Amino acid sequence: MTLPFKAVAVDMDGTFLDDRKQFDHEQFDQLLTEFEKRGVHFIVASGRPYVRLKQDFKGFADRMDFVTLNGSRLIIKGKDAASYPMNRADVLELLDDVQAKYGKMATMVFQKDIAYLHSEIDKDERDFLAYFAGNSDVIDDWDDLPEDDIYQITFGMDSKHAADVEEAFNKNHENKISAFASATFAIDVNVKGVSKGSGLERLLAKMGMTGNDLIAFGDGGNDIPMLDFAKYSYAMANGMDKVKKHAKFIAPANTENGVFRVLQKYLDEDK
């Protein structure tokens, strides 16, 4: 029997990582080696930026591919493959709009290799978010953001408002946005048309593959487009109920090494 897929895509938080934000490096090395022997690509599809993911996968990153910032920046074996930035003026307006409607909250604005957090937010909250950035700085005024491309905004707010944030902004703007519930209290905003699903579609196309060649694992709202795209889609047992409705299969929880267990089962059957 040969494996039914040629590429693996995994979300990070709540999926590939356990609740301590860790994974078994030795086990992963063995898994990755087996996939390399079979010509299978291992892809991380995350709302995290590449600068953070390189730290997460130190010693492995050059053997992998990445769909970062929910599909805004694509990396193949350490090299930029494509990127899809937001409109700067729209970003600044959205930051004002959301704060005016929902009040002050922890917010991150992601550029290529750095994320910015506003100084008026409590330091403990900033430090928590900074972990996900990998490289961050504090800014006093969003208007002072460097002129570099902006790829994502993450709002630390109840994710039930994601659809409202998207709808309210898109109603009055030509340059549209997409808003995803990335966690219970986090909303990621990207340029319209960008998602983990579109990112994987574009990445796989560069390799001569489609969603029919993909197995994917996720737990959060921003994983739904990826699960819809993949022929072999797994929601984690610990995932959101709405996410499970978009998956063909359920994997054991992230705390039970769910991704590894499912993938190892496929490898064990490929003898």
Model-identified regions with their sequence ranges:
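Mg2+-dependent phosphoryl-transfer enzymes with acidic/Ser/Thr/Gly-rich catalytic loops
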Residues: 2-7, 25, 188-271
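Short active-site oxyanion
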Residues: 39-43, 62-64, 152, 212-214, ...
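Short hydrophobic/aromatic-enriched beta-strand-loop microsegments
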Residues: 63-69, 84, 129, 233-237, ...
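Conserved acidic, metal-coordinating active-site core of Asp-based
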Residues: 104-217, 221-229, 238
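Asp-based phosphoryl-transfer active-site loop
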Residues: 4-21
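Active-site phosphate-binding/coordination module
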Residues: 23-125
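Short, structured coil segments at secondary-structure junctions
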Residues: 60-62, 70, 173-175, 229-230, ...
